[in-house]
C-alpha cells in the first residue's frame, strides 16, 4: 500500500478578530548566553504554570528549576520537535513525559505544566499526559528561580548547583514564548540575557500569509500578496464558500454502536466526478464517519487522532490525506464541515484523478494517476457513522465507530444525489439503521481506551447501584493470565449458620476476574457465592474481547463475543448490596475496612489486571474511563492501548538468574529462586538467621480467610527437621505449614470443620517433596493452593499434586510464623524449631521478611538477626575429659537422624554412646582427630569413618550428620563430605538405658564394645544437638550432669587465623581469644565485618568539623588516616587537618580529576603523593589509607599497591636507608633541630571532613564512611553527639550502606575500633595505639610501640618487648630501597603543656620518684631468670596483611641483648 501524508494550507472563512493582548512576545535567538529568570515557582504540591510557544527548531531548553543541587528538579525541553518533561523528587529515579504533538511547525502551541505532589501533568494543546515519580516523599522542594529559554552560564559551569545531570547539555531555545502565567497570574521578570521583545511574534498577528513589520512601535500587516484585507489579513470572500442549505437540517447522534447502511449493489453508481459532504461534531479522537468500497476500490473518511483522514484506492494503490487544524484538534465538540471532490480525466487511455478535501477551509488537493481508466463510483455498501466491523474495512485507519453527531451526509455525482441523513430520518427502506439513533445532536462523551501498565494500577468508579438488576459491558485485551478486572463489595454483615457456630462476617460482592487465562464471574448476594466460567477458552491472546454481563435478580448471563453463559445464584436472596466503589483493574493496596471475600481469589492473591480496557458501559451508560484516570491521577494508567512488540525478554532484563516471561508491553521477572527481590530481581532479599530460639511472627488485627494461597520461600539448613513457615489461628486448628522432616519438605494443610457447618475432612492433608535438603545449600519451596487443589514443589524437581477432601476450602489464620510456632496449643503435634537461614518469604505476593525489616508493617515481631550469620545453637563446653551428661534413651528403632556441631583441640574422645538389648548400641567418637560412627543392630558391629581431609581437632566448628533409614542405609556427613554404607540383616535398633553425651563413667570405658577406641570423654564444645528432630537442652534436660560443663563455648576457641578478621583487619591474639584492630579498614565490629557510621554529603555541600580543645591540641610525627567513600565527583576535598593559626602545618586528602591525591606540609614545603592507577569517581565504594611519618608518606587505594613518597634530602630518608625509624623518642626537644619542622605536625587544631565552606563549591558530594584519624572516629563521635564535633550544610547520617558480606568492590562502609593505653612522661602525654600491618610489605623485624626508650636519635635499634600484653607490628614487604612500613606503628601524639609553675614542681617531684622506683625495678628484673618474663610465644601472634596471625619471631640481634634487657623494663605495650 502506498500512503502519502499530505500537508495543508489554511483558508479562513469569515472575519477573525485578533486577541487584545497579542501585541508582544519574547524572542529567543538560541545563543548560549540566553535566559529569562522569573521568581521561584513553589511547585511543591498543587500548582500550575502555562505559556504559548512557537518554534521551528528540533531541540532546545524551555523551562528549568530545581533545589540547587540536591534532589528535586523539573526540566521541559524540545526533543526532536516534541516536548519532553522530566522531573524527580527526593532523589528518586527521574520520570519523563514525552508529548506526541509536534511543535516545530512555526505555529503557536499552548503548554501547561500542572504539579500535583508526585504527579506532574503536561498539556500540549489538547493533549494531556502525566507521570508519577516513585518517591518516598511527595512534595517537591524548589530553591532556584524559574528559568525559561536557557540557564545562566555560571550555573552551567558548576555542576553542583544543578540538580539535573543533563540540563547543561541542552541547547538554548530558539523561537518565541508569550503569555507566561503561574497560577493564573503573570510573574514579573527578575533578570534576563539575550532575549528580545518581538511585537510580531504573537499569535495570529498576520493571518493568511500576511507579512508583519514594526512601524512606530506597533505591528503592521502587509496583506498585498494574500488576496485578503483588513488589519490582520483576515477579511476574505467568505460568502463564496457558504453553501446553500434548506430550511431544515438532518442530524443524527451516534454513540459507538449505531450506523447507517445503504446498499449500492442493486443500483451501482458511476460517474467521472463525485462529491461527499458532511458536518460532524464530536469529542472522540478516532471514529469512522463514512466508507464505501472493497479491497481494490474504496473511499474511507474517518477521524484519526483528532484529524480528518481520507484514504482512497482507485485500483492501483492507496494514499492518505490527513487534514489537521492549525491549533488543537477537530474533536473539540464544535461543528466542522467536510467536502471531498473527485474529478476524473482521461488522456491516451490513462486516467488522471484530482482529489480535493476541505475541512473548514483547510484544503488539501492531490493529483493521482491510474494505470487504467475506470469510472468513479461504488457497488458495495455505503456505511455512515460506523460499520459491523470497522477494523476489518479495507484501508480503515481506525478500529472503532464514530461517536458524536453527523449532519447533512450527502453523496452526489453527475447523475445522482444521495441525501443519506434525510433518507435515514425519513425511514427510506433502502437505508438500514442499526441501533437506536436519535435524530438530534446529543452530547456524547469520548470513550478512549486505557491501559493498566502495572498490577498495582486501578481506577475507582462510582458505586454501582444494582440491587435488583443491572448490566455491565466492556472490551478488554491482554496477554497476561491473571488479573482482577472489576470488583465491588458491600459492608461486612454478621452471619450465623447455626446457633453453635461462631459469628462470621459476610459481604455481598461482585467481581470479574481472570485466572490462568480464563474469565470468571463471581457473585454473592448473601446466600452463597456463585463462580461462573464465562468461556471455556483462554482469553489472554492479545485480541479484543467484548464482555457483556446481564443480571436480573438471582439469575442472569455473562457473554464473551456474544457467546452467552447463564448463571444462577444459590439461596433466596435477590438483592445485591454494594456499598464500596466499583474498582476497575484492581483494588487499592491498603483497603482498611474492606473485607475481601474468600471467593475473590485474584483480590486476595494481589493479582491486578495489566492490559487494555475500552467502551465501558454500566446500565447502558458509557463511562469515560480515560477522563476518570485523568481526574484521579491514577498511577500506572495511561490513555490509549498499544501493544509493544514482544521480545522484552530478549535483552535478559531479569538479573541474578531471575526467570523472565513476556507480559503486556512489559517483562515479568520471577525472582522466587534467586534470593533477590524487585522488578528486575535487582535487590537483595533479607536473610534471617535462626538458631532454634529465634522467630518471626506477623500478626493480623483480624482473622484472615482465604481459599487460595501463593507461598514461596528459600531456606538453608544443616538440620533435617524444623518448621519453615506456618499460618496459625487463635481459635481453630487451621494451618498451612511448611517444615523440614527427615530432610524432606512437608506441607500440611488442615482446615478445621469442628466450628462450622461443613463436611468434616479426614484430617490434615500432607504432601512431601525433595530429599536430603539438609545439605546447607539454598532450596526454594513453592506452594500453590486453589480451593481443594494443592501443588508443592522444591527447586526444579517435579511438582507434587494433592487435593483436600471434603467441601470446606476456607483457611483461617491470625498469624504467619517462621522459626518457632508460638501458638502450639492449637496444634496436635509440636514441630521442631528451625535452625538455619530463611529469606524471600512470600505469602500472596507480600515479602513479609523484607516488609518487617523495612518497617512497612506494624504488626510484625522478630528476634532473628538480619544477615547470614554463622549459627551455633545452644553451645555447651565439656571442660574436662571426665565430664558427661545423660539423656533419655535415643528412640531409633526404625530410623535415626542425629546432628550436632563440635569444636575441640583433643584428638580422642567419646561423644555419644547408647547401649541396648543384646548387642545393640551406637557410639560416636573421635579417634586421632577423625570421627568414627559405630553401630550394632544385632548382627555385629559396623564402623564408618567420617570422610575428612584433615583431623577435626583443629579448634574449628564442624557439622556432623548421622542417619539410618529403614533400609539400613547409614550415612555420615562431616561438613560437606559424605560417607554411606548399607548393612544387611536386622533393620531395627533396640536401644535401652541412658544416652551418654560427652563421655561415660570412668569404669565403663573398659566395657565398651571392641570397635570403640575411646578411653576418655570428649573435651571441647558441642552445639545444635538434634536427636531425631528433638533439640534437647543438654543442661536443663540432662538426667545426670557430671564434671565441669558450662554453657557457651569458651577456652581456646578463638585464635588468630587467616580469615579471623574481615576486610584486612589486623588480628591481635589475646590469652583466650583474639580481637581485631579495624582502625584502617573503615569497617567495625568485633570481626571488622559490621557496617559503620555513614554520612551523606548533599549537593549543597556540607562539612563535619572536629576541633581539639585549645589546651589539648596534639603535635604528631606519625599520622594514620583511613576513610571510605562513594562519589561521582571529579574534583572534591575529602578531609583536611589544620594546625593552629599562624603555624601553617596541614594535611589534605582530595580528589583531582578522579584520582586520589594527598598533600601535606609540616613546616617546609608541600609534599604530594597521588594514585593515578584508578579513578574513584565511578560511584563504587573505595577505601583510602594514608600514613605519614615525618616527611615520608604512603598512600593506598582499595587493594592497589602501596605508593611510597620519600622527599629528597629529608633527614628521615637517610635514616630509612640504614634502618628503621626509632619511633621511641617522643619528647619534641629530643628531635634534631634541623628536622623538627620537617617531621612534626604541630598543634593540630581541626579536622574538616567534606571540604565544603560557605561561598565555595568544591565540597565533597556522596557518601563517606568509617573515618579514622589517629584514634579519632569522628563519624561515630558525631553520631553520638560529641560536643567537639560540628556539622554544617547538607550532611546527614544514614544507616547501613551495603551488605557486610560484600567485598570492597561492592562497597560496604564499616566502622573502626582501636585499643589505646596512655602513660605520662615529663610534660608530654603520649597515647600509643595498636596498629595493623600494611598489606604490601613483609620483614622479619618487629616494631614495638613504646612510651619511652632511652636512646638517642642515632640509635635505630628497636626496643625489645617485655612479657606484658603485646601488639606486634610487622612492616610488610615493599619495594627495594628505602623502606618504611606503609602503616607505621604508633601514632605518636604530643600534647601542648599549659601547666603552671606549681604543676611543673609537682611533675618534677613525681618524675624523680618514678625514676627511683624504676631503678629498683630494673635491679630486680635484671637478676630474674630471663624465662620468667619473656613473652609466651605460643600465645602472641603477628598480624599479616590479610588478618592472619603468625607466631612471633625473635628479632633481637645477639650483640644487642644486654641493651634490650636493660630497656625493656621501661616499655609499655598494647
From Swiss-Prot:
Chain ranges of the Laminin G-like domain: 25-206, 251-441, 448-641, 687-881, 874-1049, 1093-1291
Keywords linked to the UniProt accession: Calcium, Cell adhesion, Disulfide bond, EGF-like domain, Membrane, Metal-binding, Repeat, Signal, Transmembrane, Transmembrane helix
Biological process terms in GO annotation: cell adhesion
Pfam families: Laminin_G_2, Syndecan
Stretches with biased composition (Basic and acidic residues): 1448-1458
An example molecular function term from Gene Ontology annotations: metal ion binding
Highest taxon listed in the record's lineage: Eukaryota
One GO term describing the cellular component: membrane
Cytoplasmic compartment spans: 1419-1470
Keyword Ion transport: no
Domain EGF-like: 196-234, 645-682, 1052-1089
Name of protein: Neurexin-1b
Amino acid at each position: 500500500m502506498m500512503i502519502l501524508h499530505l500537508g495543508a494550507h489554511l483558508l479562513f472563512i469569515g472575519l477573525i478578530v485578533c486577541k487584545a493582548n497579542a501585541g508582544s512576545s519574547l524572542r529567543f535567538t538560541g545563543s548560549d548566553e540566553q535566559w529569562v529568570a522569573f521568581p521561584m515557582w513553589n511547585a511543591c504540591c498543587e500548582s500550575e504554570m502555562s505559556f504559548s510557544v512557537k518554534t521551528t527548531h528540533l531541540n532546545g531548553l524551555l523551562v528549568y528549576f530545581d533545589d540547587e543541587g540536591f534532589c528535586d528538579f523539573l526540566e521541559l525541553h524540545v526533543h526532536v520537535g516534541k516536548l519532553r518533561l522530566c522531573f524527580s523528587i527526593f532523589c528518586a529515579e527521574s520520570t519523563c513525559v514525552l508529548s506526541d504533538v509536534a511543535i516545530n511547525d512555526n505555529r503557536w502551541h499552548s503548554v501547561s505544566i500542572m504539579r500535583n505532589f508526585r504527579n506532574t501533568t503536561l498539556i500540549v494543546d489538547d493533549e494531556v499526559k502525566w507521570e508519577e515519580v516513585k518517591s518516598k516523599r511527595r512534595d517537591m522542594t524548589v530553591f532556584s528561580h524559574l528559568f525559561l529559554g536557557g540557564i545562566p552560564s555560571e550555573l552551567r559551569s558548576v555542576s553542583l548547583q544543578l540538580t539535573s545531570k543533563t540540563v547543561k547539555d541542552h541547547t538554548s531555545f530558539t523561537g518565541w514564548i508569550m503569555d507566561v502565567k503561574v497560577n493564573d497570574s503573570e510573574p514579573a521578570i527578575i533578570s534576563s540575557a539575550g532575549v528580545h521583545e518581538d511585537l510580531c511574534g504573537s499569535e495570529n498577528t498576520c493571518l493568511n500569509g500576511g507579512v508583519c513589520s514594526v512601524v512606530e512601535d506597533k505591528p503592521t500587516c502587509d496583506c498585498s500578496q494574500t488576496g485578503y484585507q483588513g488589519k490582520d489579513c483576515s477579511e476574505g470572500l467568505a460568502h463564496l464558500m457558504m453553501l446553500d442549505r434548506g430550511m431544515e437540517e438532518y442530524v443524527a447522534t451516534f454513540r459507538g454502536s449505531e450506523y447507517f447502511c445503504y446498499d449500492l449493489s442493486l443500483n451501482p453508481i458511476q460517474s467521472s466526478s463525485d462529491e461527499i459532504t458532511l458536518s460532524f461534531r464530536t469529542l472522540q479522537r478516532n471514529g469512522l464517519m463514512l466508507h464505501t468500497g472493497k479491497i481494490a476500490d474504496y473511499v474511507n473518511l474517518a477521524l484519526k487522532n483528532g484529524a480528518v483522514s481520507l484514504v482512497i484506492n482507485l485500483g492501483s494503490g492507496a494514499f492518505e490525506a490527513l487534514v489537521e487544524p492549525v491549533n488543537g484538534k477537530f474533536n473539540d465538540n464544535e461543528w466542522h464541515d467536510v467536502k471531498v471532490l473527485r474529478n476524473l480525466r482521461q488522456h491516451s487511455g490513462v486516467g488522471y484523478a484530482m482529489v480535493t478535501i476541505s475541512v473548514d477551509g483547510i484544503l488539501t488537493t492531490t493529483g493521482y494517476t491510474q494505470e487504467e481508466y475506470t469510472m468513479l463510483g461504488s457497488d458495495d455498501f455505503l456505511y455512515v457513522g460506523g460499520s459491523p466491523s470497522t477494523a476489518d474495512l479495507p484501508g480503515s485507519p481506525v478500529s472503532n465507530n464514530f461517536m458524536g453527531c453527523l449532519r447533512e451526509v450527502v453523496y452526489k455525482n453527475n447523475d445522482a444525489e444521495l441525501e443519506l441523513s434525510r433518507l435515514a430520518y425519513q425511514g427510506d427502506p433502502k437505508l438500514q439503521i442499526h441501533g437506536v439513533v436519535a435524530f438530534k445532536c446529543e452530547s456524547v462523551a469520548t470513550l478512549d481506551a486505557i491501559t493498566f501498565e502495572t498490577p498495582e494500577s486501578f481506577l475507582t468508579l462510582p458505586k454501582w447501584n444494582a440491587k435488583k438488576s443491572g448490566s455491565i459491558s466492556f472490551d478488554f485485551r491482554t496477554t497476561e493470565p491473571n488479573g482482577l478486572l472489576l470488583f465491588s463489595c458491600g459492608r461486612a454483615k454478621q452471619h450465623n449458620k447455626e446457633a453453635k457456630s461462631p459469628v462470621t462476617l459476610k459481604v455481598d460482592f461482585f467481581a470479574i476476574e481472570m485466572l490462568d487465562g480464563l474469565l470468571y464471574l463471581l457473585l454473592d448476594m448473601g446466600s452463597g457465592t456463585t463462580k461462573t466460567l464465562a468461556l471455556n477458552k483462554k482469553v489472554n491472546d492479545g485480541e479484543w474481547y467484548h464482555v457483556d454481563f446481564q443480571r436480573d435478580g438471582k439469575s442472569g448471563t455473562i457473554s464473551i463475543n456474544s457467546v452467552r453463559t447463564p448463571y444462577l445464584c444459590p439461596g433466596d436472596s435477590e438483592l445485591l448490596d454494594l456499598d464500596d466503589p466499583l474498582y476497575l483493574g484492581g483494588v487499592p493496596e491498603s483497603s482498611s475496612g474492606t473485607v475481601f471475600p474468600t471467593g475473590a481469589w485474584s483480590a486476595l492473591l494481589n493479582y491486578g489486571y495489566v492490559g487494555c480496557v475500552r467502551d465501558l458501559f454500566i446500565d447502558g451508560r458509557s463511562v469515560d474511563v480515560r477522563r476518570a484516570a485523568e481526574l484521579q491521577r491514577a498511577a500506572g494508567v495511561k490513555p490509549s492501548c498499544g501493544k509493544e512488540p514482544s521480545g522484552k525478554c530478549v535483552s535478559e532484563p531479569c538479573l541474578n538468574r531471575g526467570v523472565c516471561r513476556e507480559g503486556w508491553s512489559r517483562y515479568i521477572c520471577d525472582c522466587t529462586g534467586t534470593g533477590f527481590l524487585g522488578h528486575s530481581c535487582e535487590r537483595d532479599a533479607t536473610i534471617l538467621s535462626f538458631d532454634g530460639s529465634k522467630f518471626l511472627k506477623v500478626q493480623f488485627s483480624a482473622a484472615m480467610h482465604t481459599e487460595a494461597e501463593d507461598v514461596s520461600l528459600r531456606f538453608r539448613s544443616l538440620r533435617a527437621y524444623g518448621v519453615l513457615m506456618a499460618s496459625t489461628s487463635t481459635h481453630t486448628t487451621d494451618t498451612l505449614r511448611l517444615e523440614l522432616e527427615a530432610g524432606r519438605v512437608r506441607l500440611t494443610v488442615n482446615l478445621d470443620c469442628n466450628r462450622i457447618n461443613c463436611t468434616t475432612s479426614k484430617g490434615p492433608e500432607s504432601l512431601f517433596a525433595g530429599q536430603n535438603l539438609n545439605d546447607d545449600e539454598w532450596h526454594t519451596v513453592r506452594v500453590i493452593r486453589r480451593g481443594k487443589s494443592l501443588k508443592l514443589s522444591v527447586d526444579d524437581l517435579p511438582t507434587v499434586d494433592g487435593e483436600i477432601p471434603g467441601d470446606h476450602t476456607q483457611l483461617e489464620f491470625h498469624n504467619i510464623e517462621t522459626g518457632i510456632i508460638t501458638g502450639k496449643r492449637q496444634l496436635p503435634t509440636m514441630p521442631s524449631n528451625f535452625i538455619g537461614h530463611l529469606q524471600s518469604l512470600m505469602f500472596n505476593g507480600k515479602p513479609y521478611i523484607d516488609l518487617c525489616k523495612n518497617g512497612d508493617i506494624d504488626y510484625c515481631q522478630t528476634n532473628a538477626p538480619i544477615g547470614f550469620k554463622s549459627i551455633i545453637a545452644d553451645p555447651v563446653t565439656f571442660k574436662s575429659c571426665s565430664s558427661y551428661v545423660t539423656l533419655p534413651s535415643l528412640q531409633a528403632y526404625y530410623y535415626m537422624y542425629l546432628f550436632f556441631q563440635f569444636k575441640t583441640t583433643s584428638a580422642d574422645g567419646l561423644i555419644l554412646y547408647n547401649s541396648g538389648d543384646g548387642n545393640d548400641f551406637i557410639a560416636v567418637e573421635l579417634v586421632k582427630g577423625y570421627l568414627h560412627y559405630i553401630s550394632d543392630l544385632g548382627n555385629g558391629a559396623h564402623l564408618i569413618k567420617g570422610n575428612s581431609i584433615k583431623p577435626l581437632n583443629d579448634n574449628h566448628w564442624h557439622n556432623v550428620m548421622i542417619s539410618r533409614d529403614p533400609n539400613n542405609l547409614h550415612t555420615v556427613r562431616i561438613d560437606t563430605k559424605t560417607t554411606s554404607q548399607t548393612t544387611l540383616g536386622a533393620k531395627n535398633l533396640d536401644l535401652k538405658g541412658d544416652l551418654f553425651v560427652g563421655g561415660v563413667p570412668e569404669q565403663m570405658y573398659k566395657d565398651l564394645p571392641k570397635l570403640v577406641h575411646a578411653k576418655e570423654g570428649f573435651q571441647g564444645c558441642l552445639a545444635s544437638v538434634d536427636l531425631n528432630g528433638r533439640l534437647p537442652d543438654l543442661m536443663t534436660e540432662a538426667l545426670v550432669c557430671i564434671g565441669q560443663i558450662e554453657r557457651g563455648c569458651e577456652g581456646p576457641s578463638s585464635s588468630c587465623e587467616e580469615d579471623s578478621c574481615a576486610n584486612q583487619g589486623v588480628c591481635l591474639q589475646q590469652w583466650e581469644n583474639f580481637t581485631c584492630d579495624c582502625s584502617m579498614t573503615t569497617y567495625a565490629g568485633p570481626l571488622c565485618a559490621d557496617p559503620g557510621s555513614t554520612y551523606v554529603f548533599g549537593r549543597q555541600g556540607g562539612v563535619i568539623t572536629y576541633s581539639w580543645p585549645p589546651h589539648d591540641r596534639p603535635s604528631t610525627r606519625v599520622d594514620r588516616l583511613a576513610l571510605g567513600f562513594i562519589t561521582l565527583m571529579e574534583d572534591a576535598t575529602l578531609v583536611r587537618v589544620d594546625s593552629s593559626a599562624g603555624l601553617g602545618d596541614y594535611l589534605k586528602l582530595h580528589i583531582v580529576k578522579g584520582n586520589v591525591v594527598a598533600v601535606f606540609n609540616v613546616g617546609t614545603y608541600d609534599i604530594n603523593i597521588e594514585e593515578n592507577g584508578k579513578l574513584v569517581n565511578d560511584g563504587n565504594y573505595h577505601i583510602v589509607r594514608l600514613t605519614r611519618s615525618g616527611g615520608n608518606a604512603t598512600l593506598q587505594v582499595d587493594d592497589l599497591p602501596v605508593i611510597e613518597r620519600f622527599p629528597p634530602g629529608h633527614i628521615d630518608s637517610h635514616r630509612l636507608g640504614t634502618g628503621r625509624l626509632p619511633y621511641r623518642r617522643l619528647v619534641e626537644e629530643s628531635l634534631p633541630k634541623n628536622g623538627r619542622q620537617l617531621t612534626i605536625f604541630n598543634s593540630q587544631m581541626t579536622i574538616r571532613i567534606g571540604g565544603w565552606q560557605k561561598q565555595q563549591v568544591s565540597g565533597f558530594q556522596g557518601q563517606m564512611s568509617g573515618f579514622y584519624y589517629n584514634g579519632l572516629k569522628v563519624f561515630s563521635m558525631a553520631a553520638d553527639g560529641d560536643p567537639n564535633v560540628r556539622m554544617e550544610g547538607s550532611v546527614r547520617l544514614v544507616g547501613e550502606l551495603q551488605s557486610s558480606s560484600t567485598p570492597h568492590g561492592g562497597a560496604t562502609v564499616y566502622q573502626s575500633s582501636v585499643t589505646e593505653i596512655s602513660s605520662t612522661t615529663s610534660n608530654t602525654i603520649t597515647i600509643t595505639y595498636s596498629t595493623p600491618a600494611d598489606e604490601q610489605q613483609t620483614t622479619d623485624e618487629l616494631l614495638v610501640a613504646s612510651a619511652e626508650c632511652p636512646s638517642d636519635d642515632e640509635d635505630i635499634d628497636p626496643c625489645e618487648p617485655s612479657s606484658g600484653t603485646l601488639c606486634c607490628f610487622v612492616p610488610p614487604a615493599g619495594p627495594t630501597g628505602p623502606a618504611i612500613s606503609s602503616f607505621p606503628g604508633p601514632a605518636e601524639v604530643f600534647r601542648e603543656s599549659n601547666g603552671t609553675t606549681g604543676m611543673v614542681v609537682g611533675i618534677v617531684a613525681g618524675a624523680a620518684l618514678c625514676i627511683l622506683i624504676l631503678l629498683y625495678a630494673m635491679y630486680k628484673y635484671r637478676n630474674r631468670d630471663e624465662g620468667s618474663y619473656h613473652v609466651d610465644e605460643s600465645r602472641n601472634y603477628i598480624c599479616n596483611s590479610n588478618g592472619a596471625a603468625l607466631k612471633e619471631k625473635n628479632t633481637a640481634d645477639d650483640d644487642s641483648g644486654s641493651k634490650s634487657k636493660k630497656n625493656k623494663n621501661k616499655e609499655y605495650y598494647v
